[in-house]
């Protein structure tokens, strides 16, 4: 039976290992496409396949951009042939389990430029920057216990589209038992959260409240049985309850706005202090000569691999 209406493909060619605690790999499947593959017996936890797949579907249901995903069949023959894809542990190599695993479509290749980190000056070129507000709202309701991850795809005109990735720490994490402060799930650089109107914030709450919950539950039934752990299902159910509670959503939005206001104040204060410090270390002779010190942002983007 198709999973979420998706026919599975099987892995055919191992490309390379990727960064990340789950030790994902990049591999080609029988449909000719490249995928970021996360094995079921990954070192992070048993809930990872559920969290990744349902997290992607939840985000898509809210109108947020995510790479498409597909169940991928890992065969024993593939594992025998590609021992480099085996996971590393303190006591040696761990053979991945065979069977259906989660695969997220790789968005790079064919001259497409992907960035994992943008310099702050480039955030204004992100077309869907407002999506980060909605993503944070969803993540708080879903008990996301890690910073929100995103990659940025650049177009020919220098603009960026953000795609949200790595949902494995939703619903209390890969084992379902973690809880964090609501700011833990924020995108790491607060400058991406540019100003939004109160009407836009209200529209985000409406999107969350109007989810087709019954359809999501029906689709979950198509997942492989070993993906549907009790703690993952419970975490997802609690997430939907929070998303449907209007007063709670309003309280969360208020906390988000206040947290971002404080974060921006701290960032501005830090930048002012750095500017004062940098000019104070220049010797009078250099300053008198009219020479200036160039400060270059070091957080330039670099190609993404997961």
Which functions belong to the PLM regions below?
Residues 2-114, 141-145, 179:
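Conserved ATP-binding subdomain of kinase catalytic cores across diverse folds
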Residues 18-22, 92, 120-134, 200-205:
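A short, terminal or domain-edge coil/loop segment
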Residues 40, 159-306:
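C-terminal catalytic region of ATP-dependent kinase domains
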Residues 48-50, 57-61, 90, 123-129, ...:
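Short, surface-exposed linear patches
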Residues 57-58, 66-70, 132-139, 192-202, ...:
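Short C-terminal domain-edge/linker segments immediately following a structured domain
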Residues 71-74, 147-152, 208-215:
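A general structural signal for short secondary-structure boundary/capping elements
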Residues 79, 155, 182-184:
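Residue-level signature of transmembrane alpha-helix interfaces in integral membrane proteins
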Residues 110, 115-177:
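Conserved kinase catalytic-core segment
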């Amino acid at each position: 039976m198709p999973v979420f209406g998706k026919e599975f493909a099987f892995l055919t060619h191992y490309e390379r290992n990727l960064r990340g605690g789950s030790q994902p790999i990049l591999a080609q499947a029988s449909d000719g496409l490249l995928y970021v593959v996360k094995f079921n017996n990954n070192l992070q936890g048993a809930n990872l396949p559920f969290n990744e797949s349902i997290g992607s579907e939840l985000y898509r249901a809210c109108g947020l951009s995510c790479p498409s995903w597909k169940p991928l069949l890992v065969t024993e023959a593939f594992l025998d042939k590609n021992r480099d894809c085996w996971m590393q542990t303190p006591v040696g190599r761990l053979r991945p389990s065979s069977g259906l695993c989660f695969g997220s479509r790789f968005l790079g290749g064919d001259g497409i430029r992907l960035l994992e980190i943008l310099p702050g000056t480039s955030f204004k070129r992100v077309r869907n920057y407002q999506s980060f507000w909605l993503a944070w709202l969803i993540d708080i309701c879903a008990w996301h216990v890690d910073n929100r991850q995103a990659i940025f795809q650049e177009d020919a005109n220098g603009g960026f589209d953000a795609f949200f990735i790595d949902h494995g720490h939703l619903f209390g994490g890969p084992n379902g038992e973690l809880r964090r402060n609501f700011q833990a799930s924020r995108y790491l650089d607060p400058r991406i959260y540019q100003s939004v109107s109160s009407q836009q914030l209200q529209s985000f709450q409406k999107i969350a409240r109007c989810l087709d919950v019954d359809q999501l539950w029906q689709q979950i039934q198509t997942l492989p049985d070993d993906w549907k752990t009790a703690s993952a299902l419970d975490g997802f159910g609690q997430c939907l309850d929070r998303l449907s509670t209007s007063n709670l959503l309003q309280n969360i939005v208020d906390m988000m706005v206040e947290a971002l206001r404080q974060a921006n104040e701290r960032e501005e204060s830090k930048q002012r202090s750095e500017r004062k410090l940098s000019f104070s270390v220049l010797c009078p002779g250099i300053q008198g000569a009219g020479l200036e010190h160039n400060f270059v942002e070091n957080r330039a983007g670099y190609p993404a691999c997961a």
